Amino acid sequence: MASSSADNLTDKNIVFRKLKSKSENKVCFDCSAKNPTWASVTYGIFLCIDCSATHRNLGVHISFVRSTNLDSWSPEQLRTMMFGGNNRAQVFFKQHGWTDGGKIEAKYTSRAADLYRQILAKEVAKAIAEETNSGLLSSPVATSQLPEVSNGVSSYSVKEELPLSKHEATSATSSPKASNTVVPSTFKKPIGAKRTGKTGGLGARKLTTKPKDNLYEQKPEEVAPVIPAVSSTNNGESKSSAGSSFASRFEYNDDLQSGGQSVGGTQVLNHVAPPKSSSFFSDFGMDSSFPKKSSSNSSKSQVEESDEARKKFTNAKSISSAQYFGDQNKNADLESKATLQKFAGSASISSADFYGHDQDDSNIDITASDLINRLSFQAQQDLSSLVNIAGETKKKLGTLASGIFSDIQDRML
């Protein structure tokens, strides 16, 4: 019987069938339209679809609207509708000065609406708490599965342990968590339950059976020996490894001797080798490309001083370079004079003729100009051909369009 009544409270079809059987719930609370299919969970009232849209615009913090046919309802929401109803809400709002007419927004944002919402919420919470407590007290499962408590310790019967073999003992020690875990009871202590048994004491019980001796003969698990790395004391292995491969240039080795020799006598490079030469470019193989200067050339050459020029130009007011250096530029003057005499009877002289350059550049210039002319002529021909093609295409498209339009007109007529 209790289960059937609980199902009736959680089944929305049964709840709404009972609520809509009342005459005041057969019309909309705000506009009195017949057969409302929506409801405001916040106030427990029935609404039509138009008024439900207005409530939805107010926001869910003011009015939470749901469909009585399409939406799903929780038990708390159904209880709110059962505690509410159009008749109770109408009486409450009239007592606080609100009639059926008026603006919906002002009505549901007023102090009266807030007070009515709080009253419904308190009644629903109180009913749910009472049903929860009564369900725990009347539940046969909760009372039958609670263990008997004596002096704060549950009186679970201590079973006599069977003798274990060595194999079972080792398996039990390998999984102590599985054997020692106790599942706590999830049931709460019923209200008004009395403690049974004697009071006082810590609840310790004396063992009636003697523990088996084979439990103390269990051997602890042997830890697998860790395989050590290559020992530094093994001279034979270190010699073979040193002789088989050289150490890395950036590897740190503790067994290297101070002279750079390994144990096997093999030459091993140090961590950072000193440079073989002081030159920076010698490490990259670039030292050979630069000729080395002698020590005599590296120092500045000493200019031999003489008193010849000083004695020669003591009383001179000005000195020219030709007078100072003598006949060093006479050969150049003779060559230029000979070149000018070569073109004495010519009307014009080019730079190529004067300096003796080849005349192949003129042929190159002529070829380039000819190439430019040919390219421009070819471009003009291509442009004219493109213009002709565009004109022909335009004519073809025009004839095709006129044919299509004429065909469409013939079909329409």
From Swiss-Prot:
Residue intervals of every C4-type zinc finger in the record: 28-51
Modified residues (Phosphoserine): 318
Coiled coil: none
Gene3D superfamilies, A to Z: Arf GTPase activating protein
Record bears the keyword Zinc-finger: yes
Keyword Metal-binding assigned: yes
InterPro entries reported for this sequence: ARFGAP/RecO, ArfGAP_dom, ArfGAP_dom_sf
Biased composition regions of type Basic and acidic residues, renumbered to the chain: 158-169, 210-222
Region (Disordered), start-end ranges: 158-244, 289-312
Task of the protein: GTPase-activating protein (GAP) for ADP ribosylation factor (ARF).
UniProt protein name: Probable ADP-ribosylation factor GTPase-activating protein AGD8
Organism: Arabidopsis thaliana (Mouse-ear cress)
The organism's taxonomic lineage, starting at the top: Eukaryota, Viridiplantae, Streptophyta, Embryophyta, Tracheophyta
